[in-house]
Every structure is written in C-alpha cells, then in structure tokens.
C-alpha cells in the first residue's frame, strides 16, 4: 500500500504566503494616499478611482464583516437625502452616492478587522503608517526643493511647501496625524524594544513632517491626540497590571514643545534665515487675509442658509449660490464649492433638517459607543483616527477624497461592528466586481473626455480631430465636457441661443469669469439687455478684478451697469 501524502501545505510555505497577503493588503491601504496620478480637468479623479480599486481588492482578500444596523441606516439616510436634493441630475448626486457606497463597503472591511482580532487590525495601522512615512519623506524633499528628480512620481512645489502626493497641506497634515495614531498604537502593543525604538524614530519623522506642513489643522490634531494619549498613559501607569503601555506621559507631552522647536528651525534651514519660507509661527500670528478667512466664508454660508433653511440650495449648488448672492457685509473672494465645515455644508445644500438628521445620527452613534470609557487599544486607535478626520471635516472637506473615505469607513466599521458577518461575506465579491466595473468605466470615460483639455499633439490618435464631437456623450463627466464646449465656442448671432442655454447650465457647475462672460455676451446678442446688466453686476461683485479686466478688453460694448 502506497504512502499517503498530506493535503495540508507545510507551515514553511503557508507563512510566506500569509506574509505576502499582509504586505499586499497593507499596500492597498497606503496606495490611495501615495497615488501620483493627476491629469485632466478634475485633479482628484484618479486618486478616487485608485481608492475604489484598492477597496475592491481589499474586499476580495478579506476579512469582511458587517457594521451595526445603525451604521447602515445612517449611511443610507445620507445617500437618500443627497439623491432627493438633486433629483434627476445623476451627474450631480451620482458621485456623492457612489462615495457613500464606497464608505459603506469600507465599513464592512473595518468590521471584518474586528472579527479577525488584533493581528488583522494592524492592517489599518501599518497601511496608514507606511503612507504617512513615505509622504513625510516626500514632503520634506518638497520642502527643501529636492523633489524634482522624483517627478512624475511626486510633484515639485515651491520652496517651503510640503504636501506629499495629496497636493494640499491640510490633507497632508491629517495623514500625518493618522500615522501618529498608528505609531502610538503599534508602540503600545509591542513588547520588543527594537521595534519600539524604530517606532519612536518614525514618530520623530512624522513630527518633523507635521511642522513642515505649516497646517494649523494639523497642529490642532497633534495637540488633541497627544493630550488624550498622555492622559491614557497616565491612567495606565496607575495600575500595575496594564498589558499595553504607551510612552510615558512626560515623553508624549515633550513632543509639543519639540514640534514648535522644529517649526522654528525648518524654515531657517530652507531659506537660509532670509524669511523666504513661511514658518508655522508666522501663520499662527498672521492668519489668512481678511477676504480669504474662514470666518468670512462661514458668515457668507450662514447668510445663504438663512435664504433656504428648510430644503437648502440643492446638492452641488453652493458655488452658484455664493456667486449669485449679494451680502450685506464682506464677501469671500474665491469660488466657493464647499463650506469648509461639514455640518454647515449639509445645511446650505440639503437644508437644516437634513443636516440635523445626518449630523445627529452620527452624534447618536458616537454617544451610544461611549468613547470616554474606551480601554481596548484597537478601538482607541480607531477613535483617534476618526477624530482626526472629523476635526478636519469641521474646517475643510477631506471626505470628498478617496483615501480619507477609505480610512473613515474602516474606522466606522471597526468601532461599530455588527453581530453577523455572513451576509456581507457572501456579497463582498459582487461588491468588489461592481466597484472594479464602475472604476474601470469611469477611468475609460475620464481618459476619453480629458483629450479635449490636451494640445492636439498630445491627444490619443483617435481623438486628434473632431475631439469634441467624439467625447460629447459622456454619462459621468458631462459637466466637464459641456464646460469645454462652452469655452471653445465663439458667441455669434447664430449660436447665441444655444450658448446662452449652455452657459446657464455650466454656471451651476463652475460659475467662473470665462463662463459668466459667455452668458453676458450671449444675452446681449439675444437682446436681453436687462439680464446682461444684472449678470454683469453680479460679475462685478463676485470677481471685481476679473470684471475690470474684461471691461478694459470690451470697453466699447456698453453693457456694464
């Protein structure tokens, strides 16, 4: 009788395969933050699509659970209210609802991490830490003007600017804060002194990067996270049986003066003491110019909320609302497509009742979880990361970007896991395939419509001629196509009616000077003198310098009020 052969793979082969899977999944969490792809009319599209592809791959590689029913209800309510606010305009509410669906899928992954224990939860910590450390290095190279050799894998901004591949200093700072939470958790759950020394070094690098960002949002995150961590560390040391140990409170609190010392030194090293590089200390002293300040922005948004308090202006309508409004006081001078405060943004676009339902639902979830009683180290990490994103959302809009949607969903699932994972485990492959299909189609369509924004010699061969006609029928990026069509069309007596109608639609997508000029010129040719004068008045109020430039160029037309 022959010898029986085992069907079980030897441990020596299983272990490398398991490690390879862990490395792959860690990379999938980190990659959205590191994606260097930027092309076409909307710079964050590729980052969002890469985030969806990584999310789909994570769904396929598991583990997948299911968040609590309250989470499903909260996300579903948000999607429903957004869709109802822009009923019929798929290009407006569709992307927002897809983003909410992506967050929902990420919550299933977060719940799966809980079910697989601490080892699986380290996926989130390691992925965010890798992204944070790589971005910190890129940011410091950018800060000192040394990133040029790495283009196109990163950007090379002006001296003294650091933002990695996120292209915005507050997003960069929030990533550093997420990585700071990861370092603290990994330190607390590790017994190896060598590992702890490595994590301490990583923490110093993150601290330097945070100072280089000159982000006031990042400073608030650092102060709050470090302060809470020091309090937890003190509580740990009051009991002699604590299993997990953060660094001593005195060392944690030392990072705060160290941060300010680094913030003082960095610009002097970059600018040679000439003052050419703005420091964090200067930003805290001077703040933003009055007509660019958040306080003025929020006053304008509150005025808009008061005009439509119950139903809002509609999803995606803030930019048009701000342009068309006449304020009694000062006016925020830029195109305002976000309120830079999530509750206020929901109120101005969806209405106060919808904002109360969405924000109140989230607050109910938080209060029911009682974070102030939390002792589990994995959940403490989740609370820290969630806090960094929530704080940022009170000052800007990180949840409009794929990497932060992914981490936000993972944290929600980790903190509010459901009881049963079986239904979602079965649905995960289908959700992953759907995400890949949507991302693939959107990527193809975006490449196609982006051709009109390129010089003829840089376009794909099949789009070199008659480009606009070939890309006109886009289902996802219809606004970008119509914007290109409008700006490329000369207004004549023959096409004035069509241009006027198109300009009116595009005003709700991007109410910028070149669109306003087309609207005024077409109204003039159609004999709508009063409409042209009213629009010119709005133009002068919203963009005075652009209006003056246009008047100098068209002094003989006589349509100014």
Model-derived regions: residue spans:
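Alpha-helical transmembrane segments of multi-pass inner-membrane proteins
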Residues: 25-38, 44-61, 79-86, 95-109, ...
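Loop-to-helix entry and N-terminal half of a specific, functionally important transmembrane alpha helix
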Residues: 28-32, 202, 337, 341, ...
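Flexible juxtamembrane loops connecting transmembrane helices in multi-pass membrane enzymes
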Residues: 162, 225, 262-298, 378, ...
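TM-adjacent membrane-interface loops and short helices in multi-pass inner/ER membrane proteins
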Residues: 168, 295-336, 343, 350-356
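A membrane-periplasm/extracellular boundary helix in multi-pass inner-membrane enzymes
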Residues: 212-213, 218, 233-286, 429-430, ...
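Hydrophobic transmembrane alpha-helices and their immediate junctions
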Residues: 352-380
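Membrane-interface segments at or immediately adjacent to transmembrane helices
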Residues: 440-514, 518-519, 531
């Amino acid at each position: 009788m022959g010898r029986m052969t085992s069907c079980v793979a030897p441990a020596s082969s299983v272990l490398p395969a398991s490690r390879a899977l862990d490395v792959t999944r860690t990379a999938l969490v980190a990659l959205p933050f590191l994606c260097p792809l930027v092309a076409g009319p909307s710079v964050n599209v590729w980052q969002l699509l890469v985030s969806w592809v990584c999310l789909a791959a994570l769904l396929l590689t598991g583990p997948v659970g299911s968040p609590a029913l309250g989470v499903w209800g909260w996300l579903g309510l948000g999607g429903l209210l957004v869709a109802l606010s822009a009923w019929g305009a798929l290009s407006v509410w569709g992307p927002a609802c897809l983003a909410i669906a992506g967050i929902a899928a990420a919550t299933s992954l977060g719940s799966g991490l809980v079910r697989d224990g601490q080892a699986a939860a380290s996926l989130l910590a390691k992925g965010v830490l890798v992204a944070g450390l790589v971005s910190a290095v890129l940011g410091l190279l950018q800060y000192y003007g040394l990133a040029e050799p790495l283009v196109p894998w990163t950007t090379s901004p002006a001296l003294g600017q650091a933002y990695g591949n996120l292209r915005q200093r507050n997003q960069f700072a929030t990533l550093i804060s997420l990585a700071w939470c990861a370092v603290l958790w990994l330190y607390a759950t590790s017994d190896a002194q060598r590992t702890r020394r490595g994590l301490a070094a990583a923490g110093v690098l993150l601290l330097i990067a945070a100072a280089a960002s000159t982000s006031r949002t990042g400073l608030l995150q650092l102060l709050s996270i470090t302060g809470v961590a020091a309090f937890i560390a003190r509580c740990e040391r009051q009991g002699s049986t604590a299993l997990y140990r953060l660094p001593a409170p005195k060392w944690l609190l030392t990072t705060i003066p160290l941060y300010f010392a680094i913030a003082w030194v960095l610009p002097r090293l970059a600018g040679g003491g000439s003052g050419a590089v703005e420091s964090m200390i200067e930003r805290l002293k001077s703040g933003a110019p009055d007509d660019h300040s958040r306080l003025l922005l929020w006053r304008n948004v509150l005025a808009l909320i008061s005009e439509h308090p119950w139903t809002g202006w509609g999803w995606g309508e803030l930019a048009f609302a701000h342009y068309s409004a006449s304020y009694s006081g000062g006016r925020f001078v830029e195109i305002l497509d976000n309120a830079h405060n999530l509750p206020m943004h929901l109120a101005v676009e969806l209405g106060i009742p919808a904002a109360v339902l969405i924000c109140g639902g989230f607050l109910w979830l938080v209060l029911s979880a009682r974070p102030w009683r939390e002792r589990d180290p994995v959940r403490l990490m989740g609370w820290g990361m969630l806090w960094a994103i929530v704080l940022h959302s009170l000052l800007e809009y990180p949840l409009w970007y794929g990497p932060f949607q992914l981490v936000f969903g993972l944290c929600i699932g980790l903190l509010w896991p459901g009881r049963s994972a079986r239904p979602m485990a079965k649905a995960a492959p289908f959700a992953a395939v759907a995400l890949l299909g949507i991302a693939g189609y959107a990527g193809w369509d975006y490449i196609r419509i982006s051709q009109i924004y390129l010089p003829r010699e840089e376009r794909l061969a099949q789009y070199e001629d008659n480009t606009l006609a070939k890309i006109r029928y886009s289902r996802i990026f219809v606004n970008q196509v119509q914007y290109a069509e409008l700006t490329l069309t000369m207004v004549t007596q023959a096409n004035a009616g069509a241009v006027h109608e198109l300009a009116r639609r595009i005003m709700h997508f991007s109410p910028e000077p070149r669109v306003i000029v087309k609207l005024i010129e077409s109204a003039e040719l159609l004999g709508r003198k009063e409409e042209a004068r009213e629009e010119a008045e709005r133009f002068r109020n919203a963009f005075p310098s652009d209006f003056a430039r246009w008047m100098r160029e068209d002094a003989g037309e006589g349509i100014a009020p």
